[in-house]
Amino acid sequence: MIIYYILLFLSNILLSTSYYVKTVLLKTNFFQLIYYFANGKEGVGNITSVIEIIKTCLYFFLTSSVITILPILIIKYFKLLPLKKFIKKYTIILLVFSTLLTLKNYQLDKYIYYKLKKTNIYEKYYVDTNKAKVTAPSKKNNLILIYLESMETSLISKENGGTFTTSRIPELETILKENTNFSNTDKFGGPENITVASFTMGSLVSSSSATPVDINLFRGYSKKNIPLKNIKTLGDILKENNYNLKLIQGSPASFAGTDLYYKEHGNYEIIDYNKMKEKKYIDKDYQKWWGVEDKKLFEIA
């Protein structure tokens, strides 16, 4: 019978991870899972953040364990059914259910659909950046790109396309009003979010290369397998025009192959969390969640 109790244990682990994905990671998809499985092992975070994740999952694991064991205890106490026979069927059904639920929350169905779907978008619309002619002006301007992690237009006021009566990001909303913005609606909506550009590295790559990030479960990025090696990106174009390029971020750039991408495409000088400690911009033991908080990052920049 021990094998069936192991199945029960595995089911509760799956239910816990499913709960974490659904309530904490929210819109995590299978493309993202595969990408980070292959490329996200370095710079994943400090021990504090890992402990917080474990605590969140452990709470639900204990709760789900009590709930899933309860039917077995009821059957045993009231002798409603043959206990061994019930446990065998029950644990198998529970494992199947928890597996399907986990895959559903990771949007495996969408992953399969998009993998099988055929499209002519590249034949009709894609412009090969290696062949595109880009001419820099005689007087070149400075270019500063600021990426905001986990920021979305749903936080602005309903009047301008958000979901709140009072804006949660009034300063950013003012910037939207007073400057050029791009939207897929008649209000402030931002671009239409596509699956492979909905996570950090996917967004960085797609916005700087007009190309989706390469996702391969068994072939992560490395010095031998360079990200988008044959694609000319914004960094490549700027480097050709003698720009001095820097990537400044508050977390380790080794996570998800970020450093490999920016080194290959533009040979950026990378100033990340580890480099800031090395240059003594921050103390050796300085840590705010994943690294350096935005306010201090702007001061360093």
Each predicted region: which residue ranges?
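Transmembrane and membrane-interface helices of multi-pass
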Residues: 1-114
